């Protein structure tokens, strides 16, 4: 420590002496004047070192510690920020994967529902066709029955007409009486 102080003192003296040498010439007493200035300067340096040495040293030591602490805290903050960034990026990747999974699932469900709707529509189509076929068969049967009934009525009318033309009123009365007897016989 003392070696550093001596070195600093010597540098200051050399700087001061070169500054004094650059001045204009004075008459007489040059060495005394120079020695007095050097002694004054040495006393000033001694007082500064004696009274302000420790506070200045402490100030710079504290400043150094503060800077080192700030650097450490900055590095820690940077590491935490990088870690947080990595976590966020990982979460985003997971979210992207989740979104893709949801889209894939929705697409699969949509395809399944489409297939199910097509199958149900095919079943409904077959059911409607079967119902239509049954209705057509029923309508055809009803039409046939109606035609048979009408044909029977026409046949009866034609038969009746032919019978009326061929049968005399006495024969009609006789047939009527026989029919009444047959009907009465069935009732009993």
From Swiss-Prot:
It is a single-pass membrane protein. CDD domains: ATP-synt_Fo_b. One of its GO terms (cellular component) is proton-transporting ATP synthase complex. The keyword Protease does not apply. It comes from the Bacteria. It is found in: Cell inner membrane. The chain crosses the membrane at residues 5-25. Its main location: membrane. Keywords: ATP synthesis, Cell inner membrane, Cell membrane, CF(0), Hydrogen ion transport, Ion transport, Membrane, Transmembrane, Transmembrane helix, Transport. InterPro entries: ATP_synth_b/b'su_bac/chlpt (IPR002146), ATP_synth_F0_bsu_bac (IPR005864), ATP_synthase_B_chain (IPR050059). Disulfide bonds: none annotated. One of its GO terms (molecular function) is proton-transporting ATP synthase activity, rotational mechanism. NCBIfam families: ATP_synt_b. Belongs to the ATPase B chain family. F(1)F(0) ATP synthase produces ATP from ADP in the presence of a proton or sodium gradient. F-type ATPases consist of two structural domains, F(1) containing the extramembraneous catalytic core and F(0) containing the membrane proton channel, linked together by a central stalk and a peripheral stalk. During catalysis, ATP synthesis in the catalytic domain of F(1) is coupled via a rotary mechanism of the central stalk subunits to proton translocation. F-type ATPases have 2 components, F(1) - the catalytic core - and F(0) - the membrane proton channel. F(1) has five subunits: alpha(3), beta(3), gamma(1), delta(1), epsilon(1). F(0) has three main subunits: a(1), b(2) and c(10-14). The alpha and beta chains form an alternating ring which encloses part of the gamma chain. F(1) is attached to F(0) by a central stalk formed by the gamma and epsilon chains, while a peripheral stalk is formed by the delta and b chains. This is ATP synthase subunit b. It comes from Thermodesulfovibrio yellowstonii (strain ATCC 51303 / DSM 11347 / YP87). The gene is atpF.
